[in-house]
């Protein structure tokens, strides 16, 4: 998988996840024991990930940027690096009290922590570690 392919695939996946957050049939109310859970009343996408309008828009926007960035190798690598940084910051916010909900605007706790951590690692790999060398130039014909 190249950085371009990764940026395109993850971009499409993030756009689909962002759009899925607006489909009522895919949203489940958060569990909790008689409202004692901190999640009580917060919707969850597929029952796992926080889903608010801002949360959905942020992930869809990152996905659209990935799709656009995948048009060139430079754009894909740049997107992977920037998206990786964004996912790292979102992961860190998820473990800090008061930032784990972005002041009540966007849930970043629970399963969102490991999701953002995984996305950070994948983006970092394709942005900094996985080098896509250009295709080899055709060899000149040798004369014998």
Q: How should these model regions be labeled?
A:
Residues 1-144:
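Membrane-interface extramembranous regions
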